[in-house]
Curated annotation (Swiss-Prot):
Stated family: Belongs to the potassium channel family. S (TC 1.A.1.2) subfamily. Kv9.2/KCNS2 sub-subfamily.
Role according to the record: Potassium channel regulatory subunit that modulate the delayed rectifier voltage-gated potassium channel activity of KCNB1 and KCNB2 by altering their kinetics, expression levels, and shifting the half-inactivation potential to more polarized values. While it does not form functional channels on its own, it can form functional heterotetrameric channels with KCNB1 and KCNB2. Each regulatory subunit has unique regulatory properties that can lead to extensive inhibition, significant changes in kinetics, and/or substantial shifts in the voltage dependencies of the inactivation process.
Compartment(s) of residence: Cell membrane
MF GO annotations: potassium channel regulator activity; voltage-gated potassium channel activity
Selectivity filter (motif): residue ranges: 374-379
Species name: Homo sapiens (Human)
Ranges per topology, Cytoplasmic: 1-184, 249-259, 312-326, 418-477
Protein name: Delayed-rectifier potassium channel regulatory subunit KCNS2
Membrane topology label: Multi-pass membrane protein
Subunit and partners: Heterotetramer with KCNB1 and KCNB2. Does not form homomultimers.
Any GO BP annotation: potassium ion transmembrane transport
Side Extracellular, residues: 207-225, 281-290, 349-361, 382-388
Length: 477
C-alpha cells in the first residue's frame, strides 16, 4: 500500500466510493467525499492513510476482506458524529452528559465550535455549572477541614489545663474570657468590654470639641479631667483584661501569636509610652520635642475599636476575608490604577487650558480617583462639554471595575462567616464542667480528632439544623 491512499487502493473494490464503519456494533456505509469534507477529523484522516499500520493508528481493527473499520466507542453517540458529517453541524441533546459528549467528539477530531448556535449556549453553560459546583464543594470542604483543625486545636488547648493547679478553674476562666457567648459569665464580661471600648472612643471624640477642652496655664487646649478619669479607667480595664487572659492562657508562647491578643496589647502600649515620655519631658525640659511623640501616640487610641473584633463574628470574618483576598484586592487596585491613569491623561488634555484644578496630571489623578470610586467630592469638576463626557465615562467605568472583584470578595466573606458561625456553635456546645474526659491508653489528639470529625460533618448542615441541637457532649458519647 506504500505510496497510495486508502481511497486509491480501494476505489476498485469499494462500491460507489463507500467505506464501512463499525462503531461498537453500529454499522454504517459512508461515502468518501462526505468524509473528505472534513480532512482533519479521524475518519477524514483515515481515507488518506498509505499503510495498514497507519490505519490501525486511527481505528481499533481493520477487516481486509470486508474493508470494514472497527472502532471500540460508544455506539449511542456515533449518530451525532454521522449527523455532523452530513450537515457540518453538531447538535447536543439535553439528556446527554456534556463531558462524555466532549470526550467523544474530541476522539473523532471534531472541534466544539461546530456545535450549532441552538445548542452552543446550553452546552457550554452545562460544562461550566459542574465546575462552579465543584468549586463550591471544595470551598465547603476547606471550610469543614479548617474548622475541624481549629476546633481540634481548641480541644488540645483545653486539655493542657489537666493536672495543673486549679486547672479546671483556670479552664473555665479561659473559656469565659476568650469565647464570648460561651456562658453567662462570658456574656457579661463581653458586654462590659464593649461598653468600655465604646466609652473610650466616645471620650476621645468629645475631647476634640472646643466646648469640652480646658486651657492650661499657657492657654493651650487640654483634656477635661473628667475625660482623663474615663481614659484611666479604660486603660485599667484593658490592662486587667490582657493580664487576665495571659494568666489563664494554656500556652504563653501561642498567646501573642493571636491577632486579637496583639490588638489588645497595642491598645494599651501607647498610653504607657506616652506616660513615660511625659515624665521624661517634665524632668528634662531639653527633650520637649518628645512631647510631639506623645501627641502622635495618643492618636493611636482610635485603634481600640478593633478590640470589638473579639466580640463580633462579622469583624473577624472581615479580617479573614481581607487576609485571604489579597489577589482580588490586588486585582481591584490594578483595575482602578489603569482606569485612573487613562482618564487622568484624557482629562488633563481636555481641561488643562480651561480649568486650573486640572492643570497637571497628578491633580487629575485625584479627580479620576474620586470619580471612579463614585465618591465625587465636587472640589474639582470639568468645565468643558468634552470634559463632562469624559467624567461620565470615568464614572461608568469605575462602577464596572469595582463591581467585578467585589463579587469574589463577598463570596469569600460568606464562606468565612459561615465557618466562624460553625466554630462558635461548636464551642458553645462544649461543657468542661467536670474536666476533660479520661481516655486511658489512647492519644488525646487522635481520640478527639475521631470524635470531633463527626461533629464537624454535622455542622456543615447548619442551615437545616438549629445550633442548639448540635451538642458536642452527645457526639462524644
Amino acid at each position: 500500500m506504500t505510496g497510495q491512499s486508502l481511497w486509491d487502493v480501494s476505489e476498485a473494490n469499494v462500491e460507489d466510493g463507500e467505506i464501512r464503519i463499525n462503531v461498537g456494533g453500529f454499522k454504517r456505509r459512508l461515502r468518501s467525499h462526505t468524509l473528505l469534507r472534513f480532512p482533519e477529523t479521524r475518519l477524514g484522516r483515515l481515507l488518506l492513510c498509505h499503510s495498514r499500520e497507519a490505519i490501525l493508528e486511527l481505528c481499533d481493527d481493520y477487516d481486509d476482506v470486508q474493508r470494514e473499520f472497527y472502532f471500540d466507542r460508544n455506539p449511542e453517540l456515533f449518530p451525532y458524529v454521522l449527523h455532523f458529517y452530513h450537515t457540518g453541524k453538531l447538535h447536543v441533546m439535553a439528556e446527554l452528559c456534556v463531558f462524555s459528549f466532549s470526550q467523544e467528539i474530541e476522539y473523532w477530531g471534531i472541534n466544539e465550535f461546530f456545535i450549532d448556535s441552538c445548542c452552543s449556549y446550553s452546552y457550554h453553560g452545562r460544562k461550566v455549572e459542574p465546575e462552579q459546583e465543584k468549586w463550591d464543594e471544595q470551598s465547603d470542604q476547606e471550610s469543614t477541614t479548617s474548622s475541624f483543625d481549629e476546633i481540634l486545636a481548641f480541644y488540645n488547648d483545653a486539655s493542657k489545663f489537666d493536672g495543673q493547679p486549679l486547672g479546671n478553674f483556670r479552664r473555665q476562666l479561659w473559656l469565659a474570657l476568650d469565647n464570648p457567648g460561651y456562658s453567662v459569665l462570658s456574656r457579661v464580661f463581653s458586654i462590659l468590654s464593649i461598653l468600655v471600648v465604646m466609652g473610650s472612643i466616645i471620650t476621645m471624640c468629645l475631647n476634640s470639641l472646643p466646648d469640652f477642652q480646658i486651657p492650661d496655664s499657657q492657654g493651650n487646649p487640654g483634656e477635661d479631667p473628667r475625660f482623663e478619669i474615663v481614659e484611666h479607667f479604660g486603660i485599667a480595664w484593658f490592662t486587667f483584661e490582657l493580664v487576665a487572659r495571659f494568666a489563664v492562657a494554656p500556652d504563653f508562647l501561642k498567646f501573642f501569636k493571636n491577632a486579637l491578643n496583639l490588638i489588645d496589647l497595642m491598645s494599651i502600649v501607647p498610653f504607657y509610652i506616652t506616660l513615660v515620655v511625659n515624665l521624661v519631658v517634665e524632668s528634662t525640659p531639653t527633650l520637649a520635642n518628645l512631647g510631639r511623640v506623645a501627641q502622635v501616640l495618643r492618636l493611636m487610641r482610635i485603634f481600640r475599636i478593633l478590640k470589638l473584633a473579639r466580640h463580633s463574628t462579622g469583624l473577624r470574618s472581615l479580617g479573614a476575608t481581607l487576609k485571604y483576598s489579597y489577589k482580588e484586592v490586588g486585582l481591584l487596585l490594578l483595575y482602578l490604577s489603569v482606569g485612573i491613569s487613562i482618564f487622568s491623561v484624557v482629562a488633563y488634555t481636555i481641561e488643562k487650558e480651561e480649568n486650573e484644578g486640572l492643570a497637571t496630571i497628578p491633580a487629575c489623578w485625584w479627580w479620576a480617583t474620586v470619580s471612579m470610586t463614585t465618591v465625587g467630592y465636587g472640589d474639582v469638576v470639568p468645565g468643558t462639554t468634552a470634559g463632562k463626557l469624559t467624567a461620565s465615562a470615568c464614572i461608568l467605568a469605575g462602577i464596572l471595575v469595582v463591581v467585578l472583584p467585589i463579587t469574589l470578595i463577598f463570596n469569600k466573606f460568606s464562606h468565612f462567616y459561615r465557618r466562624q458561625k460553625q466554630l462558635e456553635s461548636a464551642m458553645r456546645s462544649c461543657d468542661f464542667g467536670d474536666g476533660m474526659k479520661e481516655v486511658p491508653s489512647v492519644n488525646l489528639r487522635d481520640y478527639y480528632a475521631h470524635k470531633v470529625k463527626s461533629l464537624m460533618a454535622s455542622l456543615t448542615n447548619m442551615s437545616r439544623s438549629s445550633p442548639s441541637e448540635l451538642s458536642l457532649n452527645d457526639s462524644l458519647r
